[in-house]
Regions:
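Asp/Glu-centered strand-loop micro-motifs enriched in Gly/Pro and often flanked by an aromatic residue
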Residues: 34-59, 72-78
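Short alpha-helix boundary/capping segments
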Residues: 110, 115, 310, 340-344
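Carbohydrate-active enzyme catalytic cores, enriched for enzymes
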Residues: 166, 194-327, 331, 372, ...
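CBM-like, beta-strand-rich accessory domains located in the C-terminal region of large
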Residues: 56, 135, 332-517
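Aromatic-lined, polymer-binding surfaces characteristic
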Residues: 56-236
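Extreme N-terminal leader/anchor segments
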Residues: 1-41
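Catalytic micro-motifs at enzyme active sites that drive phosphoryl/nucleotidyl and oxygen chemistry
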Residues: 104-109, 305-306, 339
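Short, solvent-exposed loop/turn segments that connect beta-strands within catalytic domains
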Residues: 79, 290-294, 398-400
Length: 517
């Protein structure tokens, strides 16, 4: 039985505004909804080993107990004692049923991220009720969070561990835990975020998550009575440029790595150049800020795949005229399935795939670039297939056009192009594919054209969602030129010497061209 706390060991820093929204009355009846999956009736005698959807994220959310923490927040907001009583009973039941040394306990109960997310909920509860079991559990959580062998340095989980350790340390009056948390999160931020703001987890969505969580961390540090380290403040500020440039004109983050295609990033400052090269492995370009019809593109290079990254090096995405054109398969989920594994493979991205054996984790070099107001070009190379493959990307604005030349030193390659699900094939032939959405058209041209293929594919418009999409494969060759012309239905192309002229709706565009490509 919980009893009202009259004394505390230290200050309770309750981060209740960070708990997810819930349907309070449903939770009071024992029904929960996590990660957009159908509701589950837990009842009053919760089976903590349950995972009815067989979903890793669902199980994590169950054991994180942030949904119970939200009941505490609702009690604080409304004064309704039933909410606090329900949260107290749920957390007491979890503590009783999930001792670390008991066989058969869910592996998610003491997973490092579950511990980090759950501890702040226990702290919030401790502001209103107190039992030996709750205090013992807080101490146990603190010991785990302080354990260097369980710490995820340079990872978003590590940041959550530090936030949790800080608030537990303050609650239990253990200043050494608070100080350890601040030291670790500062060192971890400098490892995870480079001076330009690129997060080494290789997914813009995680840049957004870490930025938000660092904001929580800075607030918790101040509430603890300490001064936030300026090094930590600076790394959080640096993230803002990376997030802003990774945000497409439609307000959604570009779906690179484990970034859901429907994730939004609003409100970030975006002054400065419209094209920026981030040495951590990204080129982001657009024609204008704050214009939903702006052209936009991304290019991937840099260190090999790590953490939340995909095998997307040399990959591009492209928007123009208010339309998504080239997309990638994107992020589906954290489930361990063949499809999810495929979404992380080169074949799920707009890249040249060389005939041969792929060598994962290879870095890609940005060899050169030329950035002008209406035309930019970039050259990249790597040896991901044991042989040098090179990609040259040219993007033109006004008129809009993207041209990509892929080549391999030995052997052959095929370039893959994944189109937005809104686009359907209107016509095809002779190395040309015209796609459309309503009356709007975009044309893909291949040189050489013989052997081009069009296949049905799948992309992920959101978490656990798939949509049918068109995938175009270039002919197999040692070198292939791909030209994307937005707003055009089979534009005329002419060649004179080593110059190709593409007659777009906005006017002619000239490209360097070799008959041998």
């Amino acid at each position: 039985m919980f009893w009202r706390a009259r004394t505390t060991s230290g200050r309770a820093i309750c981060l209740s505004d960070q708990f997810p929204g819930i349907k309070v009355e449903e939770v009071m009846r024992g029904r929960v909804t996590f990660v957009g999956l159908p509701p589950v009736d837990l009842g009053t005698d919760v089976d903590w080993t349950a995972n009815p959807h067989g979903n890793r994220s669902w199980a994590l959310n169950l054991h994180a107990l942030r949904w119970a923490g939200r009941l505490v927040a609702e009690y604080e907001r409304t004064g309704e004692p039933a909410y606090l009583d329900s949260a107290s009973a749920l957390i007491a039941h979890w503590i009783r049923e999930n001792p670390r040394d008991r066989p058969g306990v869910s592996p998610w109960a003491w997973a490092e991220h579950a511990v980090a997310l759950r501890a702040p909920a226990l702290v919030c509860l401790s502001e209103h009720v107190r039992t030996p079991a709750l205090w013992d559990s807080l101490a146990e959580h603190g010991e785990i969070l302080a354990d260097p062998s369980l710490y995820r340095q340079g990872h978003n989980h590590g940041l959550d561990q530090d936030i949790a350790l800080l608030v537990v340390g303050c609650r239990l009056g253990r200043a050494r835990w608070r100080d350890l948390a601040i030291r670790r999160m500062t060192a971890s931020a400098e490892l995870a975020i480079d001076a330009q703001g690129v997060l080494h987890e290789q997914a813009p969505r995680y840049g957004l998550y870490v930025h938000r969580r660092l904001g929580v961390a800075l607030r918790a540090i101040r509430e603890s009575g300490a001064e936030p380290p300026q090094r930590l403040v600076a790394r959080r500020a640096a993230l803002e440029a990376y997030i802003a440039h990774a945000t497409q004109p439609d307000g959604r983050l570009v779906s690179i790595g484990d970034s859901p295609a429907d994730a939004r990033a609003d409100g970030f400052r975006h002054e400065g150049p419209v094209v920026r090269v981030f040495e951590g492995g990204y080129v982001f370009g657009r024609t204008a800020w704050d214009d939903p019809r702006s052209a936009y593109y991304s290019i991937r290079f840099g260190p090999g795949r790590r953490l939340h990254g995909h095998e997307d090096h040399l990959g591009v995405t492209y928007m123009a005229q208010g339309r998504r054109i080239l997309v990638e398969a994107g992020f589906h989920s954290y489930e361990r399935t063949g499809f999810v594994e495929w979404t992380r493979s080169p074949q799920a991205h707009n890249v040249p795939v060389v005939t041969g054996v792929f060598k994962p984790g290879k870095a890609t070099r940005l060899i050169g670039s030329s950035i002008g107001p209406s035309r930019q070009s970039f050259e990249l190379a790597d040896d991901a297939y044991g042989v040098t493959r090179t990609r040259r990307v040219l993007v033109g604005h006004g008129p809009d056009l993207m041209a990509v030349h892929d080549s391999v030193a030995r052997g052959t390659l095929r370039s893959l192009w994944h189109f937005d699900p809104a686009l359907e094939v209107v016509s095809r032939g002779d190395g040309r594919v015209v796609l459309g959405d309503g009356d709007w058209r975009v044309t893909l041209l291949h040189f050489p054209g013989a052997g081009q293929a069009v296949r049905p594919g799948l992309v992920c418009p959101g978490y656990l969602r798939t949509a049918e999409a068109v995938t175009v494969l270039s002919p197999e060759a040692a070198g292939v030129l791909t030209v994307i012309v937005p707003g055009a239905d089979a534009p005329r192309v002419s060649v004179s010497g080593d110059v190709m002229t593409v007659h777009t709706p906005g006017g002619p565009v000239q490209l360097p061209y070799s008959q041998s490509t």
